[in-house]
Amino acid sequence: MKTLLLTLVMVTIMCLDLGYTLTCYKGYHDTVVCKPHETICYEYFIPATHGNVITTRGCSTSCPGGIRPVCCSTDLCNN
């Protein structure tokens, strides 16, 4: 009985994701799971032609530069 219990505990530990990974938006609807060292979600705007802007989103290790950067550190916060 102890062997069965120990086996179940070991299988459970191996199946669990013991590390936390951040999830950020990459596009308007697409999401990406960040690498373990990337702890920031960002969103910033790049000027384009005719007064339009290009929105860039993703994961980073620090808040990037850009026009009006928005940086945060919780899941899907860069929307």
Curated annotation (Swiss-Prot):
It is found in: Secreted. Residues 1-21 form the signal peptide. Disulfide bonds join 24-41, 34-59, 63-71, 72-77. It comes from the Eukaryota. CDD domains: TFP_snake_toxin (cd00206). Keywords: Acetylcholine receptor inhibiting toxin, Disulfide bond, Ion channel impairing toxin, Neurotoxin, Postsynaptic neurotoxin, Secreted, Signal, Toxin. Pfam families: Toxin_cobra-type. GO terms for cellular component: extracellular region. Its main location: secreted. GO terms for molecular function: acetylcholine receptor inhibitor activity; ion channel regulator activity; toxin activity. Expressed by the venom gland. Binds with high affinity to muscle nicotinic acetylcholine receptor (nAChR) and hinders acetylcholine binding to the receptor, thereby impairing neuromuscular transmission. Causes muscle paralysis, spasms and increased respiration. Belongs to the three-finger toxin family. Short-chain subfamily. Type III alpha-neurotoxin sub-subfamily. This is Short neurotoxin 8.
